[in-house]
């Protein structure tokens, strides 16, 4: 066992002495040492109860013949960090989480790992760190929260609350109506109830085979979720000494392909593209945006979940058959799903989905009745995004799939929010928010506040938005993000001027600004990208090391 390096031989007597101080005895030194990476944190609704799941996992590991060692990571709630300078820390937290997993696991030479994440950057951060460690690993998330409901039974979620702010600003909601939404949108613990970033990533873990069936859709704080935690912990002990289940053997190229298939079939958050680019690099099977676009062209969009379809939430998809049913339906298009991929249970993906059935063909549609013959995410290219940009096509109104508008430019999210609230943004505008990329922000803030204001103020079918920042999984509308190169590295988005005509064409996979090359070259003369001092040594280091969104916003490992 790997842990023999800290517990076997006379020269390890000091190490064993320290371990005995934690309660270990002679018999424990013959057992596998299992790490539990828990992301319990009180301020996040999807994480405040994970301490109990950690306790359950430790109990099950002991019963199964292992020795558990729990440790914690940090976590950032993107919803609470939204719309102020706190959002600059969200994406960078992914790197801290990955580094902390690598540090604890390798410093103590633990044999296997159980990861208990749930929300936003915590899932990809744990995956990235666990892939570096490359021991047998099982993921089990905290699970999605229930959908909220208004007094008349209308289902709502966190996105409803964000869009309600725009409606209140327009006088379309009373304070009492806004208060009801505030109090009912998030009715329980768990990751926010739609196909937002957290649930998208937990679904992708299941599709990759690094988590057990049900990981993406079983509700939080239910007996079914607790049973999933117990099974995951026992499985970690069972596979601790089996090299077949080292994480890179499970999360390989085929598994990453299957994750993107489910992402396209379910119209996941655009953040998944950013994270899967980074995860694939740690797995040694790097994806490119071109690869992702190729997968999107071969996978039908068969399930719509909030925010794309406001009445459907994760609990509904679970009742309809969950991720196995989505994979089984997607597999009917020959070659779409890599069915031979091994999962952490020891089954192949094909074996896992063989008996899956769709209980509601309106929630998980057959290929013949798909929402679209291609995936719910798209990668766009053009003179405004030479290295690529990403749009969640599942959330775009049909009338906005091809749109040309006059640019109205803002050099920060705060400027954009003030401009939208102040009435500067009119029908026919193409809002440009720049200097919000990984380097320029720094931190690549999510633009949920401005996009929700646009929707809430009734501009969703007459205004588009483009940014080198990113979006919450709750964003919907004609919103293009991840523009690369970003403004801070001299991208064309930094050269756009008010009034320039910008076109998004989803079918053509194009994002262009109607400015001649000669004029762009003239504007570039003397152009100096703006530089912001974030006032933080960590964010300064991050801005110096981070790559752009087309590269997954990973940190360079050289040029320190």
Curated annotation (Swiss-Prot):
GO molecular function, a single term: 2 iron, 2 sulfur cluster binding
Repeat as UniProt keyword: no
Cofactor note: Binds 1 [2Fe-2S] cluster per subunit. This cluster acts as a Lewis acid cofactor.
A GO CC annotation given for this chain: cytosol
Pathways involved: Amino-acid biosynthesis; L-isoleucine biosynthesis; L-isoleucine from 2-oxobutanoate: step 3/4; Amino-acid biosynthesis; L-valine biosynthesis; L-valine from pyruvate: step 3/4
Modified residues (N6-carboxylysine): 121
Coiled coil: none
Listed EC numbers: 4.2.1.9
Ligand binding (Mg(2+)): 78, 120-121, 446
Gene3D superfamilies for the chain: IlvD/EDD C-terminal domain-like
PROSITE patterns for the chain: ILVD_EDD_1, ILVD_EDD_2
Binding, [2Fe-2S] cluster: 119, 192
Cofactor: [2Fe-2S] cluster; Mg(2+)
Pfam families (alphabetical): ILV_EDD_C, ILVD_EDD_N
Enzyme class: lyase
Catalytic residues as annotated in Swiss-Prot or TrEMBL: 472
Record field: catalytic activity: (2R)-2,3-dihydroxy-3-methylbutanoate = 3-methyl-2-oxobutanoate + H2O; (2R,3R)-2,3-dihydroxy-3-methylpentanoate = (S)-3-methyl-2-oxopentanoate + H2O
GO biological process, one term: L-valine biosynthetic process
Keyword terms, alphabetized: 2Fe-2S, Amino-acid biosynthesis, Branched-chain amino acid biosynthesis, Iron, Iron-sulfur, Lyase, Magnesium, Metal-binding
HAMAP family tied to this protein: IlvD
Membership in a protein family: Belongs to the IlvD/Edd family.
Oligomeric and partner information: Homodimer.
Function: Functions in the biosynthesis of branched-chain amino acids. Catalyzes the dehydration of (2R,3R)-2,3-dihydroxy-3-methylpentanoate (2,3-dihydroxy-3-methylvalerate) into 2-oxo-3-methylpentanoate (2-oxo-3-methylvalerate) and of (2R)-2,3-dihydroxy-3-methylbutanoate (2,3-dihydroxyisovalerate) into 2-oxo-3-methylbutanoate (2-oxoisovalerate), the penultimate precursor to L-isoleucine and L-valine, respectively.
Protein name in the entry: Dihydroxy-acid dehydratase
